[in-house]
Amino acid sequence: MPEGPEIRRAADNLEAAIKGKPLTDVWFAFAQLKPYESQLTGQLVTRIETRGKALLTHFSNGLTLYSHNQLYGVWRVIDTGEIPQTTRILRVRLQTADKTILLYSASDIEMLTAEQLTTHPFLQRVGPDVLDARLTPEEVKARLLSPRFRNRQFSGLLLDQSFLAGLGNYLRVEILWQVGLTGQHKAKDLNEAQLNALSHALLDIPRLSYTTRGQADENKHHGALFRFKLFHRDGEACERCGGIIEKTTLSSRPFYWCPHCQK
């Protein structure tokens, strides 16, 4: 499943295609959304926001389209008039004069008012987004040490979107390697230096992945700069210590680690 950096880059691509352009045609597959087709035609997409793995498409009339891709949903950008060759089921079409964005296969789609945005169940549960530039390491550290999270093992905590939105499995692996910790640790057991290092890594690594083009190839590189240190590299030598990277399962997900330098 795509993680925060990939979701944000997808949103960037959608924004680049249609932001600020009048919508010439709007289509929804679900009956409960049909009344909004006419309301949105002629409106502008003002921005596309990410909250973890959810997308919020904001329109100039104050409405917001909430969509969560879950496992199978995917957005596509096409030239207006193009007919894509796909077996996927179309759910949403937002068309402008030159570009059209399409949402396929997703089922978690809603139209929200500004007031409903503040009470939506998923948006209420989800934690601060690691790609939100306003989020600081100090705030992350306070969150780690809060009663809600301080007793949680990192193996599960770093997959929990209510802790920090946008994290996922490859980020969990890379963050824990960066700070030299295994997934069994808890925030309450770390010393000050470890807490500070983890608080920074929880923001620095997702942001590096995003700025260097996200998950381009799971085995190789995140664009030009971001390269997996451990993920999908079991059996290879750890570049920090020379130990052999191992693969196991933590919280029902594949986990890669170096037994020699992660303690």
Curated annotation (Swiss-Prot):
Active site: P2 (schiff-base intermediate with dna), E3 (proton donor), K53 (proton donor), R253 (proton donor)
Reaction(s) this enzyme catalyzes, per UniProt: 2'-deoxyribonucleotide-(2'-deoxyribose 5'-phosphate)-2'-deoxyribonucleotide-DNA = a 3'-end 2'-deoxyribonucleotide-(2,3-dehydro-2,3-deoxyribose 5'-phosphate)-DNA + a 5'-end 5'-phospho-2'-deoxyribonucleoside-DNA + H(+)
GO BP: base-excision repair
Keyword field: DNA damage, DNA repair, DNA-binding, Glycosidase, Hydrolase, Lyase, Metal-binding, Multifunctional enzyme, Zinc, Zinc-finger
InterPro entries: DNA_glyclase/AP_lyase_DNA-bd (IPR015886), DNA_glyclase_Znf_dom_DNA_BS (IPR015887), EcNei-like_N (IPR044091), Endonuclease-VIII (IPR023713), FPG_cat (IPR012319), MutM-like_N-ter (IPR035937), Ribosomal_uS13-like_H2TH (IPR010979), Znf_DNA_glyclase/AP_lyase (IPR000214)
GO terms for MF: class I DNA-(apurinic or apyrimidinic site) endonuclease activity; damaged DNA binding; DNA-(apurinic or apyrimidinic site) endonuclease activity; oxidized pyrimidine nucleobase lesion DNA N-glycosylase activity; zinc ion binding
Lineage: superkingdom: Bacteria
Residues given in the record as DNA binding sites: Q70, R125, N169
NCBIfam families: PRK10445.1
Protein name per UniProt: Endonuclease 8
